[in-house]
Design a protein with these regions (language model features):
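Alpha-helical membrane-anchoring segments
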Residues: 2-486
Length: 486
């Protein structure tokens, strides 16, 4: 009897704690509806945007053909986990992306949420797995938000239900995901630039990301940049904590502060989808319900989908423990100690999280690419950005030289992994083909070379750029002598 009484007491304490967390981490039903709509819109744009670069980055006609994908040593996920592996044609890629857009529209209109959300998750994984070097932090966060939403949609209330909040482990995961990103990211910002207040200045000097407004800020007093650095740290530390507060006013303060932080990123840096996905992740935190008499937890559907809820609970626990472990090690190190099946599983579910944006310090080496082509008439053009008159001069806006953020990410990853330099000829020939299509009847390309103009950010100013030739066409590796080659 004493043992049974002790078990009941422990169970009572656990239930009380869970009830408190349920109340604190519940999601307002109307906020969830807005989140679903925004998630669907973002996925429509994501699948549509990928369709624009499908031929170049996702098919055999581009820079990452199927035979390279099958043996790619830096693949995050096995090639056979993607339904895009069923065919290497551009048409099949377009069919899959079109299916993703249709499912995204169904998500927007709330049709068949339980199976549509999982179908979207499979399609999104297949897309991201097809060319892992086109993904960045925004893609992992988008996948994770959709992942948690799949569990939430499995516990959806009936149309006639008076329930106004979503409770349970699925809601916990969706609420905690963004908080985990901010808290563990800022915990790694321990470098000297963050302490002394120069981190924002170094970040804005990164040509691959900097926007005109960011360049303008660099011309202002250093005290501005120091204040922005410390404000960023404060918001990333206290913003997510305010999101977890019980007080509606404090939660609104957390939502507003983190939203303004992302708007600042949008105005000063070209980070692709990342600010938009972070803004999407804020929507489940919006507190809209005030009248307690209307609150009816979704317990009736939690029991109906008990297995799904329990799986979500274990995944929440894994997410927290994994991110805590990442303060002492790195994902690849820890995964190498796990059984391969478990390691592959957490990779496919994006549970091998590591949020290290601009940590411990922003990078100090950056620059821009030049695909220099000498035409048959002797003229030299940059195939990456043919509109530029001075091939070797620094572009006014480096992000605009790329056809899009996916190409920028792919080329930067290719630069970071010299063992894959054999892909540079495919990149050069792709841009040659694009240039010849846009300029029919003009002089043909006689020779090409891919050059990276590397700059180093110094404590004061920026060093002169250094040319680093990544791919010469001729066997000697010297490239051709061209005007402006200093």
């Amino acid at each position: 009897m004493a043992r049974k009484s002790s078990i009941l007491k422990v169970q009572g304490v656990v239930d009380a704690i869970r009830k408190q967390l349920d109340d604190r981490l519940a999601i307002d039903r109307r906020a969830m509806d807005v989140f679903r709509w925004a998630l669907g819109c973002l996925l429509v744009l994501e699948f549509g945007g990928r369709m624009m670069v499908a031929e170049g980055l996702l098919s055999d006609q581009g820079v990452f053909p199927f035979e390279i994908w099958q043996t790619f040593p830096h693949a995050t996920w096995p090639w056979f986990s993607s339904i895009l592996a069923l065919s290497s044609s551009t048409l099949w890629v377009h069919v899959c992306l079109s299916c993703g857009m249709v499912c995204s529209l169904m998500l927007i209109f709330g049709k068949q949420l339980r199976w549509v959300s999982w179908a979207l998750l499979i399609l999104l994984h297949s897309l991201q797995a097809r060319n892992p070097w086109t993904n960045y932090a925004a893609d992992k966060l988008l996948f994770l938000l959709l992942f948690w939403a799949c569990f939430v949609f499995a516990v959806q209330p009936d149309e006639n239900s008076r329930a106004t909040r979503w409770m349970g482990f699925p809601a916990w995961g969706l609420r905690l995901q963004l908080c985990v990103l901010y808290l563990f990211s800022v915990a790694r910002k321990s470098g000297s630039t963050w302490v002394e207040g120069s981190a924002v200045r170094y970040a804005l000097e990164i040509d691959q990301y900097s926007q005109p407004l960011g360049k303008w800020l660099l011309e202002g007093p250093m005290i501005w940049l120091q204040m922005l650095t410390w404000i960023t740290l404060l918001v990333e530390w206290f913003g997510p904590l305010m999101l977890l507060a019980r007080s509606v006013r404090i939660r609104w303060m957390g939502v507003a502060s983190l939203a303004f932080l992302q708007l600042g990123f949008l105005l000063t840096m070209d980070l692709g989808w990342f600010p938009w996905v972070c803004l999407l992740g804020l929507l489940p935190h919006v507190p809209l319900s005030h009248r307690k008499e209307e609150i009816q937890p979704l317990e009736m559907n939690v029991h109906a989908w008990g297995m799904s809820t329990r799986v979500a609970g274990w995944m929440v626990l894994w997410m927290l423990l994994w991110n805590l472990a990442m303060n002492f090690t790195y994902p690849d190190t820890l995964k190498s100690r796990l059984p391969s099946v478990l390691s592959r599983g957490i990779e496919c579910l994006r549970m091998d999280q590591y949020w290290g944006m601009f940590s411990p310090n922003p990078m100090i080496h950056d620059g821009w690419f030049v695909i220099a082509a000498t035409l048959s008439d002797g003229e030299v053009v940059d195939l990456l950005d043919p509109t530029r008159k001075e091939v070797w001069a620094k572009p006014l806006h480096v992000p605009a030289t790329f056809p899009g953020d996916r190409w920028r990410e792919f080329m930067m990853m290719l630069y970071d992994y010299p063992d894959q330099a054999h892909l540079w000829p495919l990149v050069a020939k792709w841009f040659q083909h694009r240039w010849e299509q846009a300029h029919p009847g003009q002089s043909g390309v006689r020779s090409m070379r891919v050059v990276y103009m590397m700059e180093k950010t110094l404590p004061e100013g920026v060093a002169s750029p250094e040319k680093e030739q990544l791919w010469p066409e001729d066997p000697s590796g010297q490239g051709s002598s061209e005007p402006g080659d200093g």
